[in-house]
Amino acid sequence: MVQQQQQSQQRMMELHERNDREKLARKTEKEREEERRKQEDDKILQLEKKLEEFQENARFIGDLASNFQTKYQDALNGRIYTLVRGLQDLDRMKGTFSDKKVPLDLLPYLDDGKNPCLYSKHCMEKTLEKNKAVNGKIEIYKKFRAHLMKEFSEEMPDLVMYYRSIREDLDLS
């Protein structure tokens, strides 16, 4: 009896230890996932920073070139060099975003200076319209089938009864 109690206690301790190990594994898995998300966010922030720097350099070069004076030649050359270096940095960064897909339809929105969320909104609206159209077609086919079965049941009741016995899942409401 005492030996059975000891074995039972030992099994309970083993179960508790295993549960603790599983909790720790789940916790570390959550921490790893959180760390991955943080790294992704850091990459995106770094890309945003580089793009903003590139945009600012391009704007400044445009200002210098539109009001060009020879005394600003060195500043213009420096900005062009910075712009080229920024493009090289962006080219190096492209490998870290190879798993990201950007729809080509989004680019005209960005070119027009529109918010990218507008693109998402328009896509959702188009999808809703298509869903409504498809749901309408489905309803029309259901009504057609019900009407057809009604007409068949008036003309050929025996055949319709046989058909309904085969297709028990048929809902004609």
Swiss-Prot record:
Q: What subcellular locations does the record give?
A: Nucleus
Q: Which Pfam families match?
A: Med10
Query: Which biological process, per GO, is one annotated for this protein?
Result: regulation of transcription by RNA polymerase II
Regions of biased composition (Low complexity) lie at 1-10
Q: Does the keyword Repeat apply?
A: no
Give me the segments passing through the membrane.
none
Select a single GO molecular function from the record's annotations and give it: transcription coregulator activity
UniProt lists compositionally biased (Basic and acidic residues) regions at 13-42
Q: What is its main location?
A: nucleus
Cystine connections? none
Region span, Disordered: 1-42
Query: GO CC terms on record?
Result: mediator complex
UniProt keyword annotations, A-Z: Activator, Nucleus, Transcription, Transcription regulation
Q: Which InterPro entries match?
A: Mediator_Med10
What binding partners and quaternary form does the record give?
Component of the Mediator complex.
Q: So what family is this one in?
A: Belongs to the Mediator complex subunit 10 family.
Q: Function of this protein? A: Component of the Mediator complex, a coactivator involved in the regulated transcription of nearly all RNA polymerase II-dependent genes. Mediator functions as a bridge to convey information from gene-specific regulatory proteins to the basal RNA polymerase II transcription machinery. Mediator is recruited to promoters by direct interactions with regulatory proteins and serves as a scaffold for the assembly of a functional preinitiation complex with RNA polymerase II and the general transcription factors.
- The protein here is known as Mediator of RNA polymerase II transcription subunit 10
